[in-house]
Amino acid sequence: MDGGKALRVLVADDEPAIRTLVGRVLQRAGFQPVEACDGQDAIERLDASDFDAVIIDLMMPRVDGYGVVEHLIGTKPEMIEKTIVMTAFPRAATKDQLHHLCTIISKPFEVNELVALVRDCAAR
């Protein structure tokens, strides 16, 4: 990791089981996951702290993944290329700006694929 320090990854999903699974997978891979329960929570955490990568679900209450990406564009544009959008509806995500800005992973996904994507995004 980064000089022995675990890279911090924000994981935003409104499904507790998904957050827990992704968090455990990332922790086992040597990352330090930080959970957010929805898009608004993700925005608050992004404003309060720095992260090496971000994983967000596309469909969440209060603020969805699109809203989080728009917030990042306005406040931390350097984080866009470090953002992974998870979605059960990949066609919806690829039809707009997310296709060109963020890495998209379809649910369900292979955990090894997710870990590889996080490593790649954190290195950008």
Spans of model-derived segments:
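Non-catalytic signal-transmission and effector/linker regions of two-component phosphorelay proteins
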Residues: 1-8, 112-124
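A Lys-centered signature of the CheY-like receiver
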Residues: 107
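Acidic, metal-coordinating helix/loop segments flanking the phosphotransfer/catalytic sites
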Residues: 35-53
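Acidic catalytic/metal-coordinating carboxylates
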Residues: 38-41, 64-70
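Receiver (REC) domain active-site loop signature in two-component systems and cognate sites
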Residues: 60
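Hydrophobic/aromatic residues positioned on beta-strands within the core alpha/beta folds
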Residues: 86-87
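Charged docking surfaces used in two-component/phosphorelay signaling
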Residues: 20-28
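Active-site residues of response regulator receiver
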Residues: 57
